[in-house]
Design a protein with these regions (language model features):
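Conserved Radical SAM active-site core
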Residues: 1, 17, 35-112
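N-terminal pre-triad scaffold of radical SAM enzymes
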Residues: 2-29
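Surface-exposed, flexible loop/turn segments at secondary-structure boundaries
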Residues: 11, 100, 127
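Classical nucleotidyltransferase
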Residues: 105, 113, 118-137
């Protein structure tokens, strides 16, 4: 999994304290994106599922957000990291740059969807930006 960064004890990427995993790679290139450095998958550091789980489980009470970039861009690698032994009690949230209707057409993305608790879908649309909306652009 190509990871840009991991932030522990954040409250910006979902409700409550979370561990946020910022995945590299996003083909959307939304105008006004707040994280354009995430677009290129090569900007991340290759991280094994075991390493990722050690980071997630270093705070077993924190929920988890997969952001980016677009975590669904690496959907094939992520399911093993979402429901690992010990992580069952954590809420797993994914921020996704496409619409749900597109996600269910891709078998790898659909498998990841089955493993998570919350999906925030849709591309960032600068004209609709509202700073009063939580966890959205």
């Amino acid at each position: 999994i190509s990871v840009l960064s991991i932030v522990h004890d954040t409250m910006v990427d979902g409700p409550g304290f979370r561990t946020s995993i910022y995945c590299a790679g996003c083909p959307n290139h939304c105008p006004g994106c707040h994280n354009p450095q995430s677009w290129d998958i090569s900007h991340g550091t290759m991280t094994s599922t075991d390493e990722l789980m050690k980071e997630i489980m270093s705070d077993p009470f924190a929920n988890v957000t997969f952001s980016g970039g677009d975590p669904m861009f690496q959907a094939k690698a992520l399911p093993a990291g979402t429901r690992h032994q010990g992580a069952e009690q954590q809420e797993h949230l994914v921020l996704y740059g496409y619409l749900f209707e597109n996600l269910v057409k891709n078998p790898e993305q659909l498998e990841l969807l089955r493993q998570i608790d919350v999906l925030v879908d849709g591309p960032f649309v600068q004209a609709l930006r509202d700073e009063d909306l939580f966890f959205r652009g």
